[in-house]
Amino acid sequence: MEPEFDHFQSQMDSDNTHQSTMFNVQDNNAILMSGMENVLQSPRQLQAAAQAQQQAAAQAQQQQVQAQQVQAQQAQQQQQQQQNQQQQQQQQNQQNQQQQQNQQQQSQQMTQQQLQQLMPPPPTSDTSNFNDNISYFVYGSQFTVPRRYSIVKCIGHGAYGVVCSAKDNLTGEKVAIKKISKAFDNLKDTKRTLREIHLLRHFKHENLISIKDILKPNSKEQFEDVYIVSELMDTDLHQIITSPQPLSDDHCQYFVYQMLRGLKHIHSANVLHRDLKPSNLLINEDCLLKICDLGLARVEDATHQGFMTEYVATRWYRAPEVILSWNKYTKAIDIWSVGCIFAELLGRKPLFQGKDYIHQITLIIETIGSPSEEDICNIANEQARQFIRNMGNQPKVNFANMFPKANPDAIDLLERMLYFDPSKRLTVEEALAHPYFQSLHDPSDEPICLHKFSLNFEAWDLNRDLLKELIYNEMLAYHPEDPQAPYYTDLNNPNFNLSRIQSSSELFNLLQQQKQQIHQQVNQQSIKN
């Protein structure tokens, strides 16, 4: 019976297990059903969440749009402010410009009114008041001229003085008037003034500036400022070279030809200019060229000491023999200067822009090549000779490559002007006869000076009073109506022998003797009449 019991019990246990399993399944189903209920509820929640997200996104987008609108409004306001500021600035600038224009117009009107008040137009027939003086103030300096001249404007000022353009009411010509203030305070400058006046008064040439008048002071005692009246030119060669104005080969040819034509007249009088440079070559709008500023000029055969050592020529246009202190230099120094100016016309910049003496001679040798040993031996300074030897053998630069657009004849002429050895350079007559000037050269229209100059006073230690006397003497030549005009003595007259003069006092006495003799001759002639 036991087994059965056991079997039954086993069956019971099995049933119980099955029942227990059934209960477990039911529990799981209940859990599952509970989870399903949760799952069935999530779409509503998700929909609500989605709506919330959409609302949040819409709000964020709206806020972003509003922020962008605010930024756009701010940017527009800033732009408007900038435009307003620009308009205000433009208006302010316009107002400032208008004020400046008004001030300039007022200034011009005031100047014109002052000129009209100071100098009314002179009558066309009555010139009785032409000798009455009238004063202007130009750059702080009193500018006193006769009413014969109507001042137009200031055209230059510097250490040398003031230059004004003016109209000569007697002739109708336009002139330039240069005032040399305190002309007798510096003896070196006074001597330069005397030299230039004396030379220009005698030179009469189309390509040399001419002195038309030296204004007469009220008295010799009041003679402190020198006023020189000359031709009025439009510009100078330096201004033309540095301008954008195109320069053709015809321009270069005509300018250099006129330089040489004027220089021929100077050299024929045995005078060296010694300071040729573009700013000393005056030009008119019709391309007429005139050489000016002979203040550094010298007579070639001068025997006085110091002739070779005195400062001469602007460095860029200075010949090698001047820089290196050769024992003697000649008219060839002016040909060198013309060559430098010619190259500047071709290249529109200076050929040798040396910063000092050493740099200048270095540039020259690097361009035209090393000099020969014979040329080096002509240099007086041993250190200069050694410096050039230490440079070694420098080859010559090809000017045709330097100036590729230049006329071949122009290149040939330039090379012949810029030899290191002055004796190998062309003379002014040879340069004028060069093929480059074939269409211009006419020996019959290239006049020379008919008499030689001999400026013996260069050797004397002239004092202030004697220099003043000599310049006053030169002034009298322009005023034959002056009672003292008969006392005028031409220092270059062969009859006025200066060779025996040894001192300034002897010269002064000789001048007085000459004047007394002239005065006696005038009186005798008056008695006969």
Swiss-Prot record:
- Residues engaged in binding ATP: 155-163, 178
User: Compositional bias (Polar residues) spans?
Assistant: 8-20
Name the active site residues.
275
**PTM Phosphotyrosine: at which residues?**
311
Q: Which residues carry this modification: Phosphothreonine?
A: 309
Gene Ontology CC: one annotated term = cell cortex
* Record field: catalytic activity: L-seryl-[protein] + ATP = O-phospho-L-seryl-[protein] + ADP + H(+); L-threonyl-[protein] + ATP = O-phospho-L-threonyl-[protein] + ADP + H(+)
Transmembrane residue ranges: none
UniProt xrefs under CDD domains = STKc_TEY_MAPK
Region forming the signal peptide: none
The prosthetic group or cofactor this protein requires is: Mg(2+)
What does the record say about PTM? Dually phosphorylated on Thr-309 and Tyr-311, which activates the enzyme.
Q: Which UniProt keywords apply?
A: ATP-binding, Cell cycle, Cell division, Kinase, Mitosis, Nucleotide-binding, Phosphoprotein, Serine/threonine-protein kinase, Transferase
GO molecular function, a single term: MAP kinase activity
Domain (Protein kinase) ranges: 149-439
Region (Disordered), start-end ranges: 1-20, 100-131
Q: Where is the composition biased (Low complexity)?
A: 100-117
- Alphabetical GO biological process terms: aggregation involved in sorocarp development; asexual reproduction; cell division; chemotaxis to cAMP; defense response to bacterium; ERK1 and ERK2 cascade; G protein-coupled chemorepellent receptor signaling pathway; G protein-coupled receptor signaling pathway
The record, for InterPro entries, names: Kinase-like_dom_sf, MAP_kinase, MAP_kinase_CS, MAPK_p38-like, Prot_kinase_dom, Protein_kinase_ATP_BS, Ser/Thr_kinase_AS
Renumbered ranges of motif TXY? 309-311
Record entry for activity regulation:
Activated by tyrosine and threonine phosphorylation.
Q: What family does the entry list?
A: Belongs to the protein kinase superfamily. CMGC Ser/Thr protein kinase family. MAP kinase subfamily.
Q: What does this protein do?
A: Kinase involved in a signal transduction pathway.
Q: Which PANTHER family match?
A: MITOGEN-ACTIVATED PROTEIN KINASE
Q: What is this protein called?
A: Extracellular signal-regulated kinase 1
User: What organism is recorded for this protein?
Assistant: Dictyostelium discoideum (Social amoeba)
Top-down, what is the taxonomic lineage of the species of origin? Eukaryota, Amoebozoa, Evosea, Eumycetozoa, Dictyostelia
